[in-house]
């Protein structure tokens, strides 16, 4: 089995390195890269507006990294008053490392639905909520917090940018390297991969590969696109992906 990892850098490269250490044949094929978000200049003032028991959310490690870089440039600190939340363990660790604050996150699965089930997010009417995220993505968290009575604002900390490839050339390369397992960690990247690979290679190679995804929502999308052999990892971090690939 040869494994194609589409997760962006640096996590994608780390996963490939760990797979190779375990004797697996693995390749990195990142589909997106990241650049600073347009709303970063407003971040420090948005953070300063948060009071005691208000809510601060980080939806990815990338949001934390770009936010920290911006605050460092402005010689500003993370606030101590709000309650901190993260989408999952890895993002929580990154946020704790830069802020020093206690971070609440879902212990089960790193998805919006599970985050929103936390007891601390049930009675939030009248609280301010600031969500650190990238461009695009799902609106479920913001919409749900608003429905529960919170005053929600966003800071686009980074932008996802598609990396451009010659689809036929890449399909030939990965088919020649006998790739039979593909790792995809977002719906956006799954759609991008499907669109990138020309129809002939899609039907004769890509859709015959086993697909490893990180949620049932992604698995459903994959089935709609034509995949049949789909495995869902028990979480979205590299440890979970590694377990699923053993």
Swiss-Prot record:
Cross-referenced InterPro entries: 4pyrrol_syn_uPrphyn_synt_sf, 4pyrrol_synth_uPrphyn_synth, UROS/Hem4
Record-annotated disulphide pairs: none
Top enzyme class: lyase
Transmembrane among keywords: no
Catalytic reactions of this protein: hydroxymethylbilane = uroporphyrinogen III + H2O
Keyword Lyase: yes
Enzyme Commission number(s) from the entry: 4.2.1.75
Chain's role: Catalyzes cyclization of the linear tetrapyrrole, hydroxymethylbilane, to the macrocyclic uroporphyrinogen III.
Subunit-level organization: Monomer.
Protein name in UniProt: Uroporphyrinogen-III synthase
Phylogenetic lineage: Bacteria, Pseudomonadati, Pseudomonadota, Gammaproteobacteria, Enterobacterales
Gene: hemD
